[in-house]
């Protein structure tokens, strides 16, 4: 059995760890509320522009933007959204597991893949896996800014416009609630009205000043909105997962401290009993 001093040192070490995890839990809870507010603010706009862009895929117009044209897929692009930091449970590993499955699927179909990584965890994973990384952005902080994302994403959009890739996918973690986050993998381009729930009715819009300028601008905004929404969803998921993970760690530390105190008390009781036995034995010998 360990000595009383060793057990006391262990208890002190676990108590210090619990203080850290408790502080991280409180910080994550504060950041989680702000991240959820940003995510909820982005959702209505993202869903609306997704629906309008979906209607455009069924619209009656002579001009067809490349984002609306389906073509045979010889190469695909992937935008992978992960967190910059860890200590958020299985958030990143669950998403990366889905990404690996999709990458194997593309490989089995003979499709080449090029990746854009948003977040340090996904970037490191893609580097280790040997995937072709054409752009990446890290260090977004607690507040996502579209200006920081556009440069990395534009590389993929230019590749799509130039015919270097024939489809663009995005993987991120969707926020369901504080206790549940869901890894998702969606096709961003080419845009399909059926995929976003747009009715198959042939929509007939009146464009001012002309169809090309309106559609070009709208579809770029569609991509930007969905990228921003994905990052906002992922950040809300990250802070929620981190808060839950740190709470679990704090609770486990409390349990360990209780167990160690029980062991310490037993060791102390055994030492006292031994000393009393030695005293009694010595007195009897005299």
From Swiss-Prot:
GO terms for biological process: proton motive force-driven plasma membrane ATP synthesis. GO terms for molecular function: ATP binding; proton-transporting ATP synthase activity, rotational mechanism. NCBIfam families: ATPsyn_F1gamma (TIGR01146), PRK05621.1-1 (NF004144). It comes from the Bacteria. F-type ATPases have 2 components, CF(1) - the catalytic core - and CF(0) - the membrane proton channel. CF(1) has five subunits: alpha(3), beta(3), gamma(1), delta(1), epsilon(1). CF(0) has three main subunits: a, b and c. The keyword S-adenosyl-L-methionine does not apply. InterPro entries: ATP_synth_F1_ATPase_gsu, ATP_synth_F1_gsu, ATP_synth_F1_gsu_CS. CDD domains: F1-ATPase_gamma. Keywords: ATP synthesis, Cell inner membrane, Cell membrane, CF(1), Hydrogen ion transport, Ion transport, Membrane, Transport. The gene is atpG. Produces ATP from ADP in the presence of a proton gradient across the membrane. The gamma chain is believed to be important in regulating ATPase activity and the flow of protons through the CF(0) complex. Pfam families: ATP-synt. It is found in: Cell inner membrane. This is ATP synthase gamma chain. PANTHER family: ATP SYNTHASE GAMMA CHAIN, ATP SYNTHASE SUBUNIT GAMMA, MITOCHONDRIAL. The keyword Metal-binding does not apply. HAMAP family: ATP_synth_gamma_bact (MF_00815). Belongs to the ATPase gamma chain family. It is a peripheral membrane protein. One of its GO terms (cellular component) is proton-transporting ATP synthase complex.
